[in-house]
Each structure stands twice: as C-alpha cells, then as structure tokens.
Amino acid sequence: DLYYPIKDNEYISEATYPVAASKWIKENLDLSELKLYNEYNYGSYLLYEGIPVFIDSRCDLYSPEFNGDSKNNVAGRDIFSDALNIAGIAVNYDVKFKEYGVNHIISYSNSKLSMLLSNDEKYRQIYDDGIFKIFSRIATEKTNN
C-alpha cells in the first residue's frame, strides 16, 4: 500500500512542518483573535491542527476569482501572489500585513522574512524552535495598527 495513515504525528517531518510551533500556538495564542501569516508550504499542516491560516496548498481558493464578490462582479484579492511575494520579499511585508490585518507571523527560522522581522522594531520574536520562528506584530498608536 502507498497510503500510510497518520498516527500521533508519526509520519510528519518536524523539519518540514511546524509540529512544535503548532502546539505552542494552540497553548499560547488566542485562535479567535489570531490573524496569522504563514508561508505556502506548511499552511495545510497548520489547518490540520485547527489553526487559521493565511494560505494553504489549495492555491486556487486564494486567487482573485474565488475571493471576490461574484454577485457584483468584483474581483477579489490575489492572496496567493501576495503570500509568495511576502515570503520572497518582493513587496513591503509590513504594508501587506497591515492590509490583511496580520498580527502574528510564522516563518522558517532561516528565511529572508525571519531575518528581516528579527531586525524590525515593529515585530517581536515570541517563539523559536530552530526550525520555525513566530513573531508578534507590535501595534503602535502612531501608525494606527
């Protein structure tokens, strides 16, 4: 058989998926208030753990065609492209996070995004397991975040 059911995360690579970080999120953050930015590769795992995501592997659902107002023929946001552009630092991540109301970010520890957030005074690192980092977006009165 090629199908192996998941039993107690036995077949889930902790080097690829945020297994420990997901547990930490569920124990330390209010999921009802969480507006989490995550990278594309592991969004489905977060969703599997019951954590609301910015994007997961169902990329078509994050295209403008599926996020607009079809009744009024208004195209939606291109969340898929925004997610990739944020991860690749092709856009100003802070502007996009404000636009989407993001208050927390999870990213690979060695990613460009994690490196930039670690040095950005608007963000505070609140978790690091050596594979993933989680940042909190610090709201300031001056910018009305």
Where are these regions (language model features)?
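Extracytoplasmic
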Residues: 2-145
